[in-house]
Amino acid sequence: MKIDLTEVHKRLEAIRAERKITVDSQKKDYIVNVMEKFGELASAIKDYEKYSQPDWSYPSDIQEAEQEIVKAICDIAVLTLNVGAEVFFSKRVPLLDTSTAPQNVNWLSLLISDCADFECYEDYNSYVHFYNILMVCAKLCEQYGFNFQLAMEEAAKEISSHTGFFDEDTKKWKQDYRWKAQTTWYHADYELARIEKEDK
């Protein structure tokens, strides 16, 4: 499956600019943030495997687990697109072809762990790792029955709807988690990205 994340990349770039989020700040927290999301992905996959057993009595739980898997995958991809923003356009990373990509979640873990060895995220090695992380994310998404490009568009739409403010003291954008604020947020509908059986 061929995937073009150019528009998603541009949307994330606009969000960063609006919220005064620098690429350097994304680099600083990348490993911690992406490992947290990988933990959520592993947990969702574990739930999916449990709910997929023949003796499980609640089939709807499978769909919920799939949604959590796709959400975690997209979160990892968003973090990776943000931290690699300075190299992606020059290397045309937003253009992906998953036909030869591995779909092993352990491979994704290895790629993420290797990033911890980089002191900067602008050299060729980090570019290759970022590209491969996105490729594996796309393939995993496809494996669980979802179109990665459409899922990422939903994720970007949700992120752009979040409200908050830039804290001048910490120099960070802080999300407004108050209930009233959350009622205005868009919630990504990953079902819109589900691949119909005849399209697989």
Regions found by a protein language model. Name each.
Residues 1-200:
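Flexible "arm" and connector segments at domain edges
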